[in-house]
Amino acid sequence: MKKIILLLLIVIALAAGGVYWMKAGNPNALRHIVLDQCVPNQIQNRNPAPCAQVKTDAGYVVFKDRNGPLQYLLMPTYRINGTESPLLTEAHTPNFFWLAWQSRSFMTLKHGSEVPDSAISLTINSPTGRTQNHFHIHISCLRPDVREKLNAAQGEISTQWLPLPGGLEGHEYLARRVTENELVQRSPFMMLAEELPEARDHMGRFALAMAQQSDGSFVLLATERNLLTLNRASAEELQDHQCTILK
């Protein structure tokens, strides 16, 4: 009984710490940058600064994150909080994951030489795994150890959401194989909500990641928040913003 009480106290402390961390900074900083700076500057002056790109017609911007030499963020030009937003499973919402993958070229431009697709990953964190309240997909390098595990498990990843053997970074992950054609036609948010019963009404519990495999297919990864196992559902843990994989 004492162990259970101690565990609950640890979970409560971690949850409280996460809330404090989010409130300690400005959780709306990215939203202000997009809505009050990038979009108006593009419309008025045809200059996306401080963003790297503004696509008002397509509904997104690309912004260079200060964390890491090659990390970029893809964000909508309108208010969407994150994985918990019902807008992400509506047909009219842009396919942000596919748009983020198409924006990976900014990494190569910044790097000055080609960044191979095998080194690139996309992630979005859950509400408990993020510090900003404006929807943003991290476009950055994949951790080398995660790359190795995905390579080793390539033959075991199917077209259904199934547990990835051994998990990643100490947390349980579901993996699903998708083709490029599937990814173009259907958002990973829709795939998760429509194919995983427990996710349909609780999308905010999940974080998502994506990487390309050696055969040209993509692997989608989803992890669900579980404070009992100290999992805040922060898929960004699979990324290395210092890009060791390129060295």
Curated annotation (Swiss-Prot):
Pfam families reported for this sequence: CDH
Keywords: Cell inner membrane, Cell membrane, Hydrolase, Lipid biosynthesis, Lipid metabolism, Membrane, Phospholipid biosynthesis, Phospholipid metabolism, Transmembrane, Transmembrane helix
Reaction it catalyzes: a CDP-1,2-diacyl-sn-glycerol + H2O = a 1,2-diacyl-sn-glycero-3-phosphate + CMP + 2 H(+)
Gene3D superfamilies membership: HIT family - CDH-like
Annotated Gene Ontology cellular component terms: plasma membrane
Pathway given in the UniProt record: Phospholipid metabolism; CDP-diacylglycerol degradation; phosphatidate from CDP-diacylglycerol: step 1/1
EC identifiers of the protein: 3.6.1.26
Transmembrane stretches, start-end: 4-24
Gene Ontology biological process terms in this record: CDP-diacylglycerol catabolic process; phospholipid biosynthetic process
Subcellular location: Cell inner membrane
InterPro entries, sorted: CDP-diacylglyc_Pase, CDP-diacylglyc_Pase_proteobac, HIT-like_sf
GO molecular function, one term: CDP-diacylglycerol diphosphatase activity
Its membrane topology: Single-pass membrane protein
Keyword Transit peptide: no
HAMAP family from the UniProt entry: Cdh
Family stated for the protein in its record: Belongs to the Cdh family.
The protein, known as: CDP-diacylglycerol pyrophosphatase
Species per Swiss-Prot/TrEMBL record: Enterobacter cloacae
Gene designation per UniProt: cdh
